[in-house]
């Protein structure tokens, strides 16, 4: 009798454990990637005061890990040194894309590898007051040297994003020049950056 009870207990325990394991959602691995030479051209007209800038923003999707031409399926977009997010509203910038997602961003000063989680309260969206990633030398992700006309990413500036569909990513911009070569100004407006993308809904950790 005791043997029968033990067998029944084992069977019931196995079924319960198996049922629980099926209910638990298996998490996807956090994705770490590097993008090289993403071209973000712009046209500047210096005949006006102040000079005007035009050109399409180059849209990027973290889920696919690449450039997209889709007007709605994008997370961030680049033009020159400006980075837009697909969330909030228009800033009034010429040629900016329409926002139709819930993307947002903030900048944190830290070592890229040490930024392991998201601070929800820090997120900002684009709007009439400006871009979530501030523009201008020293305000956001870069410094501009007026003597050399070079743009340099600020060491320790990590860009944290909420994507258009509510997932999370962090970005470390390595260079603004093609093949990481700032010696020729013709190489400007080519982004190279590391990013980590959290592909699991509701997960805010980058580990």
Regions found by a protein language model. Give the residues of each.
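Sec-dependent signal peptide recognition
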Residues: 3-10
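C-terminal motif of bacterial Sec signal peptides marking the signal peptidase cleavage site
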Residues: 16-19
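Surface-exposed, beta-sheet-biased, low-hydrophobicity segments with strongly acidic/polar composition
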Residues: 21-207
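Basic side chains
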Residues: 2-3, 22
């Amino acid at each position: 009798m005791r043997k029968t009870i033990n067998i029944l207990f084992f069977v019931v325990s196995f079924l319960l454990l198996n049922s629980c394991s099926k209910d638990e959602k298996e998490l996807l691995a956090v994705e770490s990637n590097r993008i090289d030479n993403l071209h973000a051209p712009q046209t500047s007209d210096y005949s006006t005061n102040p000079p005007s800038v035009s050109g399409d923003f180059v849209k990027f999707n973290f889920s696919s890990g690449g450039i997209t031409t889709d007007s709605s399926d994008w997370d961030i977009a680049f033009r020159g040194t400006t980075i837009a997010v697909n969330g909030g509203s228009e800033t009034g910038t010429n040629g900016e894309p329409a926002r139709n997602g819930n993307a947002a961003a903030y900048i944190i000063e830290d070592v890229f590898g040490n930024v392991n989680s998201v601070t929800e309260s820090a997120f900002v969206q684009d709007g009439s007051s400006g871009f979530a990633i501030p523009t201008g030398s020293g305000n956001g992700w870069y410094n501009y040297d007026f003597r050399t006309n070079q743009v340099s990413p600020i060491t320790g500036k990590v860009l944290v994003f909420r994507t258009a569909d509510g997932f999370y990513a962090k970005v470390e911009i390595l260079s603004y020049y093609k093949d990481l070569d700032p010696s020729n100004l013709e190489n400007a407006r080519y982004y190279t950056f590391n990013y980590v993308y959290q592909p699991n809904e509701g997960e805010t950790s980058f580990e």
